[in-house]
């Protein structure tokens, strides 16, 4: 089961004591700040978690999987995420203990 923004807001309500409206607004505001920074071309660095960066990809040849026809894949900007060392360590520590769904 995936962790959702609603789950995060619920945890803020339960553990921090914000009311549900404030918790939802805080979660939305947090992600809006990340979206806005990336939209403005600013990398996002969250210490202990990881970095969101922008990368420009050049146009490249591609293929339509149904027809086999060659088609160009246009140049575009993509968001990349690189996990920080603390996050990597914690995930790797649990890698053998959790069943994948």
Curated annotation (Swiss-Prot):
Coiled coil: none annotated. Signal peptide: none annotated. CDD domains: IHF_A (cd13835). GO terms for molecular function: DNA binding; structural constituent of chromatin. PROSITE patterns: HISTONE_LIKE. One of its GO terms (cellular component) is cytosol. One of its GO terms (biological process) is positive regulation of metabolic process. Keywords: DNA recombination, DNA-binding, Transcription, Transcription regulation, Translation regulation. The keyword Chloroplast does not apply. InterPro entries: Hist_DNA-bd (IPR000119), Histone-like_DNA-bd_CS (IPR020816), IHF-like_DNA-bd_dom_sf (IPR010992), IHF_alpha (IPR005684). Belongs to the bacterial histone-like protein family. Heterodimer of an alpha and a beta chain. HAMAP family: IHF_alpha. PANTHER family: DNA-BINDING PROTEIN HU, INTEGRATION HOST FACTOR SUBUNIT ALPHA. This protein is one of the two subunits of integration host factor, a specific DNA-binding protein that functions in genetic recombination as well as in transcriptional and translational control. This is Integration host factor subunit alpha. The gene is ihfA.
């Amino acid at each position: 089961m995936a962790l959702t923004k609603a789950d995060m807001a619920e945890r803020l309500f339960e553990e921090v004591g914000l009311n549900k409206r404030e918790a939802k607004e805080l979660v939305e505001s947090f992600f809006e700040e990340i979206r806005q920074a990336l939209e403005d071309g600013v990398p996002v660095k969250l210490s202990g978690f990881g970095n969101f960066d922008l990368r420009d990809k050049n146009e490249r040849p591609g293929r339509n999987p149904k027809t086999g026809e060659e088609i160009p894949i246009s140049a575009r900007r993509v968001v990349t995420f690189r996990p920080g060392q603390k996050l990597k360590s914690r995930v790797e520590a649990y890698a053998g203990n959790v069943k994948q769904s």
